């Protein structure tokens, strides 16, 4: 994947559930978008601090920390799936229960800074993996 741009996938290339997410991605180079998003996320969330990171807008809703944990979990899952596609592994990919994962996470006990550090390291690893894919992948 030496190119920094990819064509937007055709509707038949992803489950209809993801159509809204795909539509939200701006046009542009993949790596630049991923890098900009990482910077923007850090700039938005780091100033919140620890007390605000525990905020829930309603009972039984995720805190900001838990949302960040979910972002990290999702990036891990989708990066793993991208690796499987790149390696032409045809084994069926199971889904995952994000609600169960949220119930069993330790995001609420971690500091906001550690969660954001983890998210940044994870994005750096994602970019490294994607840059390492051959064009044919």
Where are these regions (language model features)?
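Aromatic-glycine hotspot motif
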Residues: 1-64, 76-137
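Histidine-centered divalent metal-coordination motifs
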Residues: 70, 74
């Amino acid at each position: 994947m030496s190119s920094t741009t990819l064509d937007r996938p055709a509707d038949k290339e992803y489950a209809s559930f993801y159509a809204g997410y795909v539509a939200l991605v701006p046009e542009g180079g993949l790596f630049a978008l991923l890098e900009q998003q990482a910077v923007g996320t850090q700039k938005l969330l780091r100033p919140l601090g620890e007390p605000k990171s525990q905020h829930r807008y309603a009972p039984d809703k995720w805190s900001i920390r838990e949302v960040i944990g979910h972002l990290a979990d999702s990036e891990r899952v989708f990066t793993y799936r991208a690796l499987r596609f790149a390696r032409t592994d045809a084994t069926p990919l199971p889904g995952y229960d994000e609600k169960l994962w949220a119930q069993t996470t330790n995001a609420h006990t971690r500091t906001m800074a550690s969660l954001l550090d983890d998210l940044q390291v994870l994005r750096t690893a994602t970019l490294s993996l994607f840059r390492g894919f051959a064009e044919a992948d």
